[in-house]
């Protein structure tokens, strides 16, 4: 079965904009319903897709938070170039971490983080999560168990996970620099 890669979206509505940021291994589909809801409330919403997301796990692990941060900044700059001066940011998981980083990096009106980590128990636990994601992705591709196991043995998400850990530490150290209204939703 061929998987169709998701696409970034922009839902035009009002003069104020919301940048919607997905999590690690996720994509814009994860925030699409929220985007439609906010559009109905008069907000223009834009959701990018970070490099390597929405595609194969092998492609995902070729990138790091430095690449994804550039994608976030490009999405923010895109809204600014379109004339949006009032931009809020809503992020899910890793997207929430990027939302916090935006809060002390560029002018924004407010932040919502949803289920965003500030640390993780172990790299092994994160590694297992990536491998579970990879296994499910490959099942959707229609691959058999032997093929999946062989491909997963070749997958090494270590550098991507290390970059997430570094980002979390950097954001933790800068939280006190955030001065805009911030809602933290944690479950």
What are these regions, as identified by a protein language model?
Residues 38-57:
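Conserved alpha/beta-hydrolase
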């Amino acid at each position: 079965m061929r998987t169709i890669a998701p696409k970034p979206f922009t839902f035009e509505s009002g003069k104020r904009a919301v940048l919607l940021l997905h999590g690690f291994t996720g994509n814009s589909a994860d925030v699409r319903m929220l985007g439609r809801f906010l559009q109905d409330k008069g907000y223009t919403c834009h959701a990018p897709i970070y490099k390597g997301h929405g595609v194969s796990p092998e492609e995902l692990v070729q990138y790091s938070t430095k690449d994804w941060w550039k994608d976030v900044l490009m999405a923010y700059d895109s809204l600014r170039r379109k004339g949006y001066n009032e931009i809020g940011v809503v992020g899910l998981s890793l997207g929430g971490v990027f939302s916090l980083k935006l809060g002390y990096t560029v002018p924004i009106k407010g932040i919502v983080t949803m289920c965003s980590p500030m640390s993780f128990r172990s790299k092994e636990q994160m590694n297992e999560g990536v491998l579970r994601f990879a296994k499910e992705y490959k099942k959707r591709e229609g691959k058999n168990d032997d093929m999946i196991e062989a491909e997963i043995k070749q997958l090494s998400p270590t550098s991507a996970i290390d970059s997430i850990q570094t980002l979390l530490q950097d954001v933790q150290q800068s939280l006190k620099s955030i001065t805009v209204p911030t809602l933290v939703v944690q479950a």
